[in-house]
């Protein structure tokens, strides 16, 4: 049976919860698309997030890895296209580290691209009535750090991988006036679809998903 590893993060930046873990934890031990789901919470810390991720990949030996993170202020399921080889933290991580203009991987490529069928994910999630789009930036905080590290680690492995950013949950958005949110049940459904589509689609669709700015 195939295995799918889905990761999420602990709360950070003063939040009581992280919507990524609230959603991903509910998928643990589920069967989706004929595959067993393994959920893992990562520390929101540059120094240890990849250590935990790599150890989990080695233990689980997944066929597919989807990392999920919070993007407060975004309104939809943001399917990330690319990770860049830069850590530039606007705020300290949960361990107090705040790297500025440092590489994720010294000597590594400037960027690494998701190996998920990102256009098919957007199309499928939208078809279910859930807002989704291709995102051209995963930021320069721990989410981008994990996405870059993940894609680098999978280069010599058969597994596919990528990153999805999700909005605040409503209970978070009330503390951020004007910020969009998405219900937990909707996020969970979208992630279920992301797993199913990623397992089923080998060659991505050719659909416009770029940005003008």
Curated annotation (Swiss-Prot):
Homotetramer. This is Pyrrolidone-carboxylate peptidase. It is an enzyme of class 3 (hydrolase). Coiled coil: none annotated. It is found in: Cytoplasm. Pfam families: Peptidase_C15. Removes 5-oxoproline from various penultimate amino acid residues except L-proline. One of its GO terms (biological process) is proteolysis. The active site is at 80, 143, 165.
